[in-house]
Amino acid sequence: MLEVKGLTGGYGNKAVLDSVSFDVHKGELFGILGPNGSGKTTLLSMLSGVLDYKVGSIRIRGRDLKEYSAKQLAQVIAVLPQHSSLAFSYTVKETVSLGRYAHQTGWFHSWTSEDEVIVQRVMKQTGVADFQDLHFERLSGGERQRVLLAQALAQEPEILFLDEPTNHLDLSYQKELLDLMRKMAKELELTVISIFHDLNLAGLYCDRLMLLEKGQIQVINVPNEVLQQERIQEVYRTTIEKHPHPALPKPQMFIVPEKHVCDFAPLEIDETYLTVGNEIIQLNSPIPLRTMSSGVTGSGTGWHQHFVNRHVHRDYNYEDHFAEMSDFLKTHGFEPQETVGMMTAVFLDTVAFKFLRDDDFSVFIIVTAGVGNAIDASLADQHSWISTPGTINTWIFVNGHLAEEAFIHSIVTATEAKVKALHDLRVLDKVTNTVATGTSTDSILIAATQRGKALQYAGTITPLGKLISRGVYDCTVEAIKKNRKRIEEL
């Protein structure tokens, strides 16, 4: 659809672009990225015929751009500008109708029924038909942008150029506009070429991305390849981190603010932050901790500052336990979004905790454990599914900076240590009469201060893994013994 070869040029004697070559396929949503001054707007001006170029070629549908008359070009390409303004006062419909100019013939440019059908269709597609009689200047920024998009679509172009189309739009309008662009690219095979400042939006919506740097192409590829952490840091000269989108297989880039000296101050989570009561065990950290957990609240990964292990009756049963737990936390002064919350049917005074230190990092481990519903995982299919409150709840606080894989290693290591504790105590699955590996609803938390020593791994023979193994084993054994003794005393 569009083929660019060796494009060089700029303004006056100043060359902004240097030997730029690429192609864009029919029905593709193609994003152009780059820092300020990289040549994005200059390139778009050349592609749309607004700015001449000195060297190279631009071919649209196999025909050189310079062979098109202005009217012919307007029948093939349309441009949605960055700013939404008009020199004269028009209604929405009149504004959209201007897009039909390129298709009108004769001296009097008569309005045809086909023009009317097309204008009504694109107004409906862009969601502006309901206010087509309102004046353009009375509309919000997002509405104006949609009207100008309808005007561009009224040209019935094969290629649509967008110059930072979401720059002045609210989040909802950004999503609406880009959802529509992607839909039209897929369903109508409209070729969309857009400049983006927002790397995350570009990564979410584009089929391919082109990254410019100082007038030259740095890379052209699918979003996940273009949006590499090291590359973006080098081109944009700032610190970022790359993470996957939580709902889609798309990359997302996050800027990392420069840390203040207080962000590096030593901090050790230990017994001084722990409070054990009859109803809850709570640990309140002075800073948010990076977490990975299977809690009722705060599950998955995140940042949390408060940690609650709540005692409930063994017959506890709520259809929406998340909502009930959230309400409970609120009534006790905790914000659910900032709290990892767990439940247990064991008495909280049987808790076991232990602080262990290595040369330059430490861990604080807390375990509540009962084995009334112990299960051998290898024979779990012999059990019926009954949701009961978590019985072995394990908290591991790491005073160090964990890598992503170290969180997962920590869970694996802790699980192995827990299984060994149950084996040594001869905890049996009451259904199968075999040694249990855990209970039906065990929960775990890994929380790191993200300060101090960088800890890449937490396997069983690593320094961190050794502390976790010993701490979880000892605390699990102690908690089970204390719980057994408590039951005997009842």
Predicted regions and their residues:
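Conserved catalytic motifs of ABC-family nucleotide-binding domains
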Residues: E156
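The feature captures the beta-strand-to-loop junction immediately N-terminal to the Walker
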Residues: L33-P35
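Conserved ABC transporter NBD signature motif
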Residues: G56-D64
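Alpha/propeptide regions of enzymes that mature by internal proteolysis
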Residues: F264-L490
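ABC ATPase nucleotide-binding domains
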Residues: R237-D270
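Helix-to-loop junction immediately C-terminal to a conserved catalytic motif
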Residues: S48
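Catalytic Walker B motif of ABC-type/P-loop ATPase nucleotide-binding domains
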Residues: L160-E164
